[in-house]
């Protein structure tokens, strides 16, 4: 069958119309865009602690730990005096002293062993002045080593207050002076423990004085006392701790 020119034009127009209609009926693809990157969130600063800030004065502060020999061969060892002259940190003291907070940091590498001038103030029967250099150096090496304080891994001992309550004596807490019992979170050699420490404080002329004297077991801090010769020579678990801290209000400091 022959198709004339008019029919050919009609057929071509129909095909073109069908093509246009089919393209209109297809859903249009909306180009997808990647979601915008999340805005970087800066870490929030720690909340301000209430009270007037006092900074520890290292040159006027001192921590002393008395460690005692034990075991069947105790007479072959020495009692040792460990000290820090490098205490750092701060106290924040509001009008209500019991709401005070503090943080004390002790750089482990600065701990000394058996300073003659400090031993001279102790009972000479328990702490004679003549400790051999080898014994002093060996004790410090063992103390800073991985089996005890692990100074290379954990360079600081950190003490943070958790709560403060009056000591169990009448009139223990005053605005200028008093005695309290502080519950402290201690971090020693990476181990976190909670201990209670009696503190006597005095506030005068922009200066805070805090002192204490107490027995404390190494195991309370998560430490294992040093032992040698299969336990024949040991360091006793119980130590004696004394501290005297001076902190002062910095220039321009104001209650927060």
Specify the residue positions occupied by each region the protein language model found.
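Bacterial N-terminal signal peptides that target proteins for export
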Residues: 2-13
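A composition/secondary-structure signal for short, hydrophobic, low-basic-content segments
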Residues: 6, 22-24
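Bacterial N-terminal signal peptides
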Residues: 12-22
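Low-complexity, acidic/polar, glycine-enriched regions of mature
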Residues: 24-256
